Regions:
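Residue-level detector of anion-binding/catalytic polar loops
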Residues: 33, 65, 101-106, 158, ...
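Alpha-helical recognition/docking segments in bacterial nutrient-uptake
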Residues: 1-18, 74-192, 252-254, 258
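Hinge/beta->alpha junction and helix N-cap segments in small-molecule ligand-binding domains
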Residues: 80-91, 109-121, 178-189, 204-250, ...
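Alpha-helical structural signal in soluble globular domains
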Residues: 58, 95-99, 151, 215-227, ...
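Short acidic/polar active-site loop segments enriched in Thr and Asp
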Residues: 33, 65, 135-136, 199-202, ...
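Flexible loop/turn connectors
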Residues: 6, 232, 248-370
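N-terminal helix-turn-helix DNA-binding module of bacterial transcription factors
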Residues: 1-71, 365-370
Length: 370
């Protein structure tokens, strides 16, 4: 079944007495938090037995049947703070939807933009996410922050999160179900490959304020330090990934420092790197080698881009797998799944020539004279 998009327009009906009775009313009647009431009604046995009894009694008095409440088989795929047509997240959605269908579940799709700076107590969830009779659990993709995660926890909404794109301290995820692509290892593998070719003047181009760039940079940094090399980066404060690559490379070349290879934080950034190098008449890989990360557009570029492949469809499958396990066993310990990356060797890398260990300005001058 195709994922359905939930838009802002919805038909309204006149509220009835039954409509007005929900989780908040049960929590108030039982004198517990909304999160506790949600956990009890979802079957979480870790809640104190006396509290469970009180919540279930109050739910019964209010006409709420937990068994009926838990019959819905619909998940919400929430794409936060990212473009709806983003290639990588579209493939995650595709993998998630396929696994839902294979397991007899439906999925709705929501685009949700929010500020990471708004306190969780002031953040307003889409109403459909708070309808436990409509949505059983949530898959968080896109770019997410601690405030939304805290809010879902507080409301007792079951969810799983794509960890790579969580802004802030990812230690905060230890109490939640989370799936990662191992892009730290991917950054490390890409850097090690460049080092194996003889490169020593390797720069990272990205925006480490964004978590997926920060994780790739961390792998790069570790590999450089393993070999006694200095990790250096050209950062651009933008969310346009191609622009990050273009402006970051222009800035790097203007510094007039030695550079023989560039690790771009992802493939769209590598596309921007290509454009900046060609504007300066620098050839890839003859003058400067380039590697990307994620394998989204690498085969479209010329020369074909060496990169670290992530597996977005597999990420989507694992996100669904974890959240279905959470639904089946609400009291299980938080789970973390790490999906390995794979280095893909193509045509954008080669060994450095002796002349390429000179400064970027000297390399540019040589390229211009040709």
């Amino acid at each position: 079944m195709m994922a359905q998009r939930v838009g802002s327009k919805r038909m309204k009906k006149a509220p009835t007495k039954k409509d007005k009775v929900g989780l908040r009313e049960v929590a108030a009647a039982a004198n517990v938090s909304v999160a506790t009431a949600s956990r009890v009604l979802s079957g979480n046995t870790r809640v104190d037995r006396d509290i469970q009894k009180i919540v279930l009694e109050q739910a019964k008095k209010l006409g709420i049947d937990p068994a009926q409440r838990n019959k819905t088989k619909t998940l919400a795929f929430v794409l936060s703070n990212r473009a709806m047509l983003h290639a990588f997240h579209s493939r995650i959605l595709s993998g998630a939807e396929a696994h839902c269908t294979a397991n007899g579940w439906d999925m709705v799709f929501l685009s949700f933009n929010y500020s990471p700076h708004v306190p969780s107590t002031e953040l307003h969830l889409p109403r459909v996410l708070q309808r436990h009779d409509v949505i059983r659990a949530v898959i968080l993709a896109g770019t997410n922050s601690e405030n939304l995660i805290k809010l879902l926890d507080h409301k007792g909404i079951a969810f799983v999160v794509l960890g790579n794109n969580v802004v802030g301290d990812q230690q905060d995820l230890k109490n939640n179900d989370v799936v990662f692509a191992d892009d730290i290892q991917g950054g490390k593998d890409a850097t090690r490959y460049l080092i194996s070719l003889g490169h020593r003047h390797i720069w990272f181009v990205g925006n480490t304020r964004l978590p997926w760039f920060a994780r790739c940079f961390e792998g790069y940094r570790r590999a450089m330090e393993e070999h006694g090399l200095v990790a250096r980066q050209s950062n651009t404060d933008s969310e346009d990934e191609t622009e990050i690559g273009y402006l970051g490379t222009k800035s790097l070349l203007a510094r007039d420092e030695p550079v023989t290879a560039i690790l771009a934080g992802n493939d769209p950034t590598a596309h921007g790197v290509y454009k900046a190098l060609r504007d300066r008449n620098l050839k890839i890989p003859d003058d400067i080698s380039v590697i990307g990360c994620d394998d989204t557009v690498g085969t479209w570029l010329s020369p074909a881009l060496s990169t670290t492949r992530e597996f977005p469809e597999q990420l989507g499958k694992q996100l669904v797998e974890l959240v279905l396990k959470r639904i089946a066993r609400p009291d299980q310990d938080p789970q973390c799944v790490m999906i390995p990356t794979e280095f893909i060797k193509r045509d954008s890398c080669g060994p450095p020539r002796a002349s390429r260990t000179k400064t970027a300005g000297e390399t540019l001058q040589r390229a211009t004279i040709k």
